[in-house]
Amino acid sequence: MEQAYCTAVFWRGGEKIDLNGLKPDAVRCLSVTGERKVNLSFLRDYPNLEELTLMEKCEGVEVLSELKQLHTLSLWLSAPVSWDNVSLPGLRVLHLRGEKNGDITPLLSSITNLHLEEMRKTEDLTPFLTPATRLQKLYLQSLPAVQKLPALDGLPSLYALKLYELHKLSDLSALSHSHLR
């Protein structure tokens, strides 16, 4: 049975954490929203997190390396963070929304599912795809500046590609050299 998302909301005047009656070590899915900058060290209390959504402002992402069960990460940050000291070998799904998530290259080597969304200024997708050699599913949504798909031949396991609202996309020649079945 799929667990509902628990929520942690932080604003200037306080915070509210709703665990749906669960103890922290029983929480598998958590959504964190920070209208003020949130130090993520509190996530140490949630060692069994499998899915995590981070929105708005946060710091201390290094703590994510301690979440050994984490396989799905969604980011929609309003201020970039450094991912250089974060190791997530179990991460399989990465959902990026917006362009202020920082250089996420260190997160890409193990993922099999990548969703890029609402990146208004991003023209070249190559920096996201080159390190993601295990990628199986790629979802591209609301990327208005993308005119051309990058080479996909370096993604031998890619079998699913979804394109949605890429209004300037005019060059699909990369598909002919891909491993898509």
Across the structure, where does each feature detected by a protein language model lie?
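Concave beta-strand-loop units of leucine-rich repeat
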Residues: 2-18, 23-63, 69-147, 151-170, ...
